From Swiss-Prot:
This is Small ribosomal subunit protein uS11c. Part of the 30S ribosomal subunit. One of its GO terms (molecular function) is rRNA binding. Belongs to the universal ribosomal protein uS11 family. The keyword RNA-binding applies. GO terms for biological process: translation. One of its GO terms (cellular component) is chloroplast. The keyword Ribosomal protein applies. InterPro entries: Ribosomal_uS11, Ribosomal_uS11_bac-type, Ribosomal_uS11_CS, Ribosomal_uS11_sf. SUPFAM superfamilies: Translational machinery components. Keywords: Chloroplast, Plastid, Ribonucleoprotein, Ribosomal protein, RNA-binding, rRNA-binding.
Length: 130
C-alpha cells in the first residue's frame, strides 16, 4: 500500500499562465506594478513601498525597477510568455519599469499609455510655493 504524500504549498500556484497584462501605475510618490491574467485575476503585485523604500525614495526610478523585477520574477515562475503593458500616471518610474519589463525576456504584445486625461474637468490643485 502506497503512502500519501503531504503537499507543501497550495494547488493554486500550479496552473501555468501563458498570457497576461502588466499594469504600471506611476505616481510622483510611488510606483505600483500589478500583473493579471487576461480575465483580470491578479497573479502578482509589487510596489516601491512594498520593496522596502520609504518616503521620497519610493518615487525614484530605481524603486520602480525593483518593483517591476519582483513582479517579473513571479511571472517567470508561472511560465508567462507574452504580456500586454498598460502604463498610467506621470511618475518618474514609468520609463524605468517599462525598460525592466522589456529586458526580462517576456514578449510584449503591445504597450499602451492609459493615463487619464481630463477634457477640462475638475480644477487642478494650486501651484506649490516652496
Amino acid at each position: 500500500m502506497s503512502k500519501t504524500i503531504k503537499r507543501i504549498g497550495s494547488r493554486r500556484n500550479e496552473h501555468r499562465v501563458l498570457k497576461g497584462v502588466i499594469y504600471v501605475q506611476a505616481s510622483f510618490n510611488n510606483t505600483i506594478v500589478t500583473a493579471t491574467d487576461v480575465r483580470g485575476q491578479v497573479l502578482s503585485w509589487s510596489s516601491a513601498g512594498a520593496c522596502g523604500f520609504k518616503g521620497t525614495r519610493r518615487g525614484t526610478p530605481f524603486a520602480a525597477q525593483t518593483a517591476a523585477e519582483n513582479v517579473i520574477r513571479a511571472l517567470m515562475d508561472r511560465g508567462m510568455e507574452r504580456v500586454e503593458v498598460m502604463i498610467s500616471g506621470p511618475g518618474r518610474g514609468r520609463d524605468t519599469a517599462l525598460r525592466t519589463i522589456r529586458r526580462s525576456g517576456i514578449l510584449l504584445s503591445f504597450v499602451r499609455d492609459v493615463t487619464p486625461m481630463p477634457h477640462n474637468g475638475c480644477r487642478p490643485p494650486k501651484k506649490r510655493r516652496v
